[in-house]
């Protein structure tokens, strides 16, 4: 018979789900007579209310090969057993918003992602239910090896027109907040508003669960099913911090020229907010200049879009050539022709057209109605935000969902005709605040994301989008059918907008933690984008190091002519490309359940993989972050001091990347420290103590050691040690054991370093013998730029 579901009449321990993973212990979820959720017989949520129900997943796991046992059902030799289950509840009253206790969480370490702003999430840890934050999007309970308890994931999802998040309840209860976003949309019975999943691997845990949810909902595609836009391989420049709303064609041109002249030509350019035609409701929509003169912080929020065409600053562009085109189309064409490195130009727009939406009753624009945003109880618990205050005060000109396609087509068709390659779609999670009269948040989101997806497929090759201000499960579960690149952290704040002078430093640690931990969840849907930074900021190198190994695009928002070219050249190649990792960076296991911002002892450690080596980044981010009492980010200077951690080759998830690396049989790794410029040989289980001052870093290239069987020569490529992601330069690697020959395909230029236990007889680059240095078992050879990103073939003969 089928595995039993939990109901309010359950009188014995019901096994909901079991899974056998190879030689690993059998994993099972059950509910005992005392109403406790158990994993392998050990409670993780206790005193579960009688109205909580569960159902098993209906399809075999796409990941695991299960073995039959007494709790499973065989069907044509395939079991229907799963390592997870869906959770629901019954109530007697149909409402638009339910807060439902799920069970008590006590004494188990957890890591979570919660919304601290309407549109941004971050990391939070604790051990008891009352320590949870409102608007929690994902909750992972730590495993206990001695008890045999695996990692447990609690993932709030969507059911019909309702969306779920987690929050703290009374007496350490974990509560589910299940809401429709409209008082007209009510419900009383839910079968699958939350998903529980088990795994002994925290990275597979989330990936597997997302696959199950995808099968259940059918409303999104995972990242591995999509192709991110080509800008992820490039260095870029964004106009935001350089100009804010005062961006203009001459400034964009001068910005690209300054970077190009300095040897760091951008491969893509983002023209941020400030190019559109907008106005306040009391401005004359014909002149439009009044709206464009509102450039102080917050002044643009009440403005609304009044035409698809660019504003007068870009519309009046002309290059002086009688035969040249004017306006945005002429500017983009001239920019790409003059600066050949620029392959893509993106522009910014809000999901609703502009911050204040679309202005009603404007000729040439779709119908729009000013809607007063309504904040849910969970959103009211987020951080105070000037943008939200201004938008609530002035309302949003919402284009009805049946006309969203017309709006996106209008914006995007004009941009496509002007030579624009993609869009940064911002202010995405404003939509949930506008859903009262439009069928609720889920239905309104479905309509808008369907229209956006259709337009992107039509005008921008299906993937020419950067999603921003999108941090909520509505977006990830409904809006990622085509979108494959998105921001995973709050904005880069060069200083604290609240005026704390120390924010110049501690906010940078916050940003890094946002991006690293959010990627654990978001990276299953979109390729993580760690946002821009400025190369002259006091923490610029700190930022650059994290971006270089993030696996995503790397771009800056430098003011025109104000650049640190020495730093830029540590991650930008002369053709505007970058040395990108194969995967996206994630926190290491030993800091998943720790607080790298304000416990004074935890180092943020992130791992990634290149083709032939791993990379481990160590960052001291301690010094400030979310404060539950004041419900805002604030300084915690008492924790801003030197931090010590242990680093090991084991910290790298060799089998969890996009292209897993087989290290079976590898006994020793050559580990190169970028800042210390030293190399150590380490066994996989070796641990090295590293201490870092506040807002400083170290990058470790971890390269498996190869041994020539003929002469027992040890060899490991490090890469270009002048580049932050040194190992990313090694693009091909071939060992000829019989000839004692190594061939390395190197991308980029600078100093190539390799470890070799013996001095090579000779070294050749593209068939020509070259000089090299050999000291302390390190071979160093200079690689010249070949004129493009084609590989230089470097040969070492022993």
Swiss-Prot record:
Gene3D superfamilies: Aldolase class I (3.20.20.70). It catalyses: alpha-D-galactosyl-(1->3)-1D-myo-inositol + sucrose = raffinose + myo-inositol. It holds the Pfam family Raffinose_syn. One of its GO terms (molecular function) is galactinol-sucrose galactosyltransferase activity. Keywords: Carbohydrate metabolism, Glycosyltransferase, Transferase. This is Galactinol--sucrose galactosyltransferase. Its EC number is 2.4.1.82. Optimum pH is 7.0. It comes from the Eukaryota. Inhibited by 1-deoxygalactonojirimycin. Not inhibited by stachyose. Strong inhibition of the hydrolytic activity by sucrose. It comes from Pisum sativum. The lineage of its organism: Eukaryota, Viridiplantae, Streptophyta, Embryophyta, Tracheophyta. Transglycosidase operating by a ping-pong reaction mechanism. Involved in the synthesis of raffinose, a major soluble carbohydrate in seeds, roots and tubers. Able to utilize D-ononitol and D-pinitol as acceptors. May also act as a glycoside hydrolase. Belongs to the glycosyl hydrolases 36 family.
